[in-house]
């Protein structure tokens, strides 16, 4: 049996994973799975708004309502608000407690069900909650030490992800600003008309038709598209007589055009 030190090392090793290695749909599934294996429980991670970031069901609970939460990737508002008022780890909560993850209809099935909730902090901010539970068997002091360490590790990873997202947003906005600054008034007019033709972020367009409608030459549209493509704002592909296929890959351009 791994001792407390070995389990602690397994948890802290999670920090060696880069943010880029996180899954897109549920970024913390692997992390929740590792925590569930180490602490021997079911586990889930939610952000401050109750959105499910990852979960692992080591033990089947057979509760349809809980599984519906996982499928919807969203916990109920009432539960999220109650969890947000937990400022320190609340351990071994019974099925009678409002913070139990066991629905009321499963109390008779799992009378010994126990839930532990640990707040997740990062950079002095509340980022979410780590929720673990068992159908029976209390979480020991060693388990709770691991829970405290786990919530800290998850908080660091969440903060890293937020930082990565912020840096990505800044990079994209800078690219948009630089691209816009290279456009003439006519080219800006052309870009606004072109993107207005798209169905969402992509679509097919015919440059000559747009040029005639807004009173500019086709070459202005071609130049505008080249500038946006070279800046990494759009991708385009010629469809021959059918026109041009266009896809926006930096959505910051839409917000910038609203200022035009």
Swiss-Prot record:
Chain segments carrying region GAF domain: 1-159
Pfam families listed in its UniProt record: CodY, HTH_CodY
Key words of the record: Cytoplasm, DNA-binding, Repressor, Transcription, Transcription regulation
Localisation: Cytoplasm
Keyword Phosphoprotein applies: no
GO cellular component terms, A-Z: cytoplasm
DNA-binding region coordinates: 207-226
Gene Ontology process terms (BP): negative regulation of DNA-templated transcription
InterPro entries documented for this protein: ArsR-like_HTH, CodY, GAF-like_dom_sf, GTP_trans_reg_CodY_C, Transc_reg_CodY_N, WH-like_DNA-bd_sf, WH_DNA-bd_sf
CDD domains: HTH_ARSR
Entry annotated with the keyword Protease: no
Any one GO MF annotation of this record: DNA binding
NCBIfam families attached to this UniProt entry: codY_Gpos, PRK04158.1
Family: Belongs to the CodY family.
Function, in words: DNA-binding global transcriptional regulator which is involved in the adaptive response to starvation and acts by directly or indirectly controlling the expression of numerous genes in response to nutrient availability. During rapid exponential growth, CodY is highly active and represses genes whose products allow adaptation to nutrient depletion.
UniProt protein name: Global transcriptional regulator CodY
Organism: Streptococcus pyogenes serotype M1
Taxonomic lineage of the native organism: Bacteria, Bacillati, Bacillota, Bacilli, Lactobacillales
Gene that this sequence comes from: codY
